[in-house]
Amino acid sequence: MPVTVFAGPDALRLALRLQSPGDYVVASNWNGPGSVVIEPDVAHRTRQCPCCAIRLDLVDGLLRAARRARRPRRILLVADPSDDLTTMTYTLLSDADLARHVRLDGVVMAVDAVAAATRIAAPGLLGNELELDALAVADAIVLGRSGELTTDGFGRLVSALRDVNQVGHVCAPALSARGDDRPDDDVVMGLDAWHGAPTVSTAGPSVSRRDRDDVPDTVVLRQAAPLDPDAIDEWLTWLVDTHARRLLRMQGALAVVSASARVCCHGVRSFAMSHSEAADPVTSRRDDSLVIVVGHGLDVDELSSGFAATRAR
């Protein structure tokens, strides 16, 4: 069952606008029809280890929704502004009970275009640290009230969003033919964005935000030749082990010499998982590899050289 996570100050409003019959909304600040109420309850798989924090209430709430007598069509999970989205995605991906019932479909960031444009004109950041972390990993960024911006103001806002996010697409429904703030369902849901080859909006090798510690880095790594299986496995283990506390998202599609199809991998914090791309719609053999790493304090040169060394000799 697909789970779409909504984040941002306007997340609940957007989720409720998109809710259709058969959808369940799981949130801490909504108790309406077709909803499951949760209250943040964080535990640690290893005592006091922040890289393995898990939301117990999220596990319980999603399982309650998924096990309803009338099975939901999909689940719309709304993050409270004070929630750590990384803990939520870690819980969704790493909990074995959840994995049997639900699948992370994508992260949608709801942004008030007027408020965001005002902040960057100040000048300032697009949000606080939690909001920036969510923005950096979002698969869709929905701009509310985008029709109230000037053409120049809209362009500056999209450019600022692209400085932080390199994995998602920007949606401005108010500028569409319909002209309201409700995006089409297929723009923000049904993405299955965390389990296959990553989508990257930049053509460059990497994007770095070294100038500010509170703005996440995004590093994009590419190889045009097959990889050595032992070398890439060792590199991925090193990546997760050394970056777990600051790893917001890792995702890749790897052409390994010993595999008939590319190997897809994804992870967050201390969790990582892989599967064959043959399980996804695209099954043809490709020799190109792509990995995105989103986190804080990433060393672009270290990541690039380590990944380059995994090339098969």
Protein language model annotation of sequence segments:
Residues 1-3, 214, 287-289:
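A short, charged/proline- and glycine-enriched loop
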Residues 3-7, 76:
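Short hydrophobic/aromatic beta-strand immediately N-terminal to the Walker A/P-loop
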Residues 4, 16-20, 310:
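Non-catalytic terminal/linker segments enriched in charged/polar, low-complexity residues
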Residues 9-73, 80-83, 87:
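N-terminal phosphate/diphosphate-binding loop that engages ATP/GTP or pyrophosphate donors
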Residues 58, 107, 232, 293:
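Residue-level signature of catalytic and energy-coupling elements of molecular machines
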Residues 60, 68-173, 178-179:
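Phosphate/Mg2+-binding loops and adjacent switch elements
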Residues 130-279, 298-300, 310-313:
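C-terminal accessory "lid"/substrate-recognition subdomains
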Residues 281-299, 305:
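An anion-binding loop in the catalytic cleft
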